Amino acid sequence: VNPANRNLLQGSGTSRAIYQAAGEQELTAACEAIGRCDLGRAVCTPAFGLPAKYIFHAVCPAWHGGGFGEAEQLAGAYHSALELAAEYHCESVAFPLLSSGNYGYPKEQAFRIAVDTITQYVMEHDLTVYLVLYDRDSLAVSRKLFASVEEYIDDHYVAQNDESYGFGRRCRELSERRRLLEEDAALPMLGAVPAPAAAPRTA
């Protein structure tokens, strides 16, 4: 998932890295063909040179103090990209921590929104989701909050849904998957199964 602006122009940081890896000319042309995307929404392009099928461009809010609908817009960007992943029959999708870089969203709040939105979605959809953390501050926040995330899932989902949907198994996998934070700062969140060593091309 590319953290995008409304004009779908190449940004800095993660966005620049995605454009360079995919092929700037091809990806720029694909985004220009789409034109614009509303804040809190996402659009899809081919992945071109990236080892994935698609790139979902999620238009993220900048932080203006929290009183301008930023939380709803950020949750919407995650949800829209997740809906695209389902629409395009993806088995997995990887997100950076949206809006937490140059857009200035406080990392702890950004992480909570990411986890809450992704958790609610994957409880009803068979999709493996990775939240990729690039810096020490984001990793520190994730370590601080992850135990409370597991407790929240247990309290709100497992008891009533375990028999029908196997959510208990999904949640038990969280303990093992948290270990990946210590290894490579990539957090696979609540997917139906752990990603295999030779995983299929992902979005």
Regions found by a protein language model. Give the residues of each.
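Glycine-/small-residue-enriched capping loops at alpha/beta junctions
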Residues: 2-87
